[in-house]
């Protein structure tokens, strides 16, 4: 079965849509920054970001809506990533991981925490034990956050490895972001087990994910897929036919416009 790629103009348009979606998602993904005005006590770093969406919290609808909006935008971004990367190494896997970040954000916006550790002492105590952390894995809201974290960390590293061929600068940037996201996630677990607040590291990880999404948006706007299309002057010329066959079978590459 032969799979026909969309025309170059259509792929470019899809890439641009993915780029602008990524930039939009970068803003909405870090909507917790608005808590400085909606819930000042939660902006100090001690509370979980998800507590902003808990029932009864002021403007909880705003933060849940922002999670849903960013999730949808990230899923669209995944399509743009796939279209631009095409047949590059890890292209499909990177696109799936980006989409998983979006799905995780969607689930975050449609589910809530079972309790608020910043105001519930029993809930806070459960957060600081290994058994309590394992019990949280039975909650969809916790699972979605874990999926989003792992997908962002692994996706950023794999995207960086993919980009090293066409742009070492972009590749190193993506890898650095991915490793830092992973480090903050591991630090969160250590802090939870130690009974310390993780609000600061959780917010840092969220900002890093937003930075990654913004980087993807800029990358998609600057990237230009190269399509190899050769049409022989003489359809009956064996040499010309061979040239066309080789050109059509070549793996598409991607170039990135570097700023000076």
Question: What is each PLM-predicted segment?
Answer:
Residues 1-20, 223-260:
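Actinobacteria-biased recognition of intrinsically disordered, low-complexity terminal regions
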């Amino acid at each position: 079965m032969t799979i026909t790629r969309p025309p170059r103009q259509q792929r470019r348009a899809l890439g641009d849509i993915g780029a602008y979606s990524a930039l939009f998602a970068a803003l909405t993904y870090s909507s917790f920054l608005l808590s400085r005005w909606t819930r000042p006590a939660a902006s100090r770093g001690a509370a979980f970001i998800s507590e902003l969406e808990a029932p009864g919290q002021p403007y909880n609808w705003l933060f849940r809506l922002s999670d849903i909006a960013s999730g949808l935008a990230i899923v669209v971004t995944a399509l743009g990533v796939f279209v631009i990367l095409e047949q590059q190494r890890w292209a499909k896997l990177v696109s799936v991981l980006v989409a998983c970040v979006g799905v995780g954000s969607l689930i975050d916006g449609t589910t809530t925490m079972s309790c608020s550790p910043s105001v519930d002492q029993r809930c806070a105590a459960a957060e600081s034990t290994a058994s309590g952390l394992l019990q949280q894995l039975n909650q969809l809201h916790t699972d979605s956050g874990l999926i989003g974290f792992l997908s962002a960390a692994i996706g950023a590293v794999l995207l960086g490895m993919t980009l090293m061929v066409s742009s070492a600068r972009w590749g190193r940037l993506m890898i650095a972001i991915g490793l830092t996201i992973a480090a903050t996630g591991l630090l969160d677990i250590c802090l939870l087990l130690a009974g310390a607040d993780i609000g600061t590291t959780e917010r840092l990880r969220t900002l890093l994910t937003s930075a990654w999404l913004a980087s993807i948006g800029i990358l998609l706007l600057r990237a230009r897929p190269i399509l190899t299309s050769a049409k022989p002057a003489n359809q009956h010329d064996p040499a010309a036919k061979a040239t066309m066959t080789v050109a059509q079978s070549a793996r598409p590459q991607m170039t990135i416009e570097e700023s000076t």
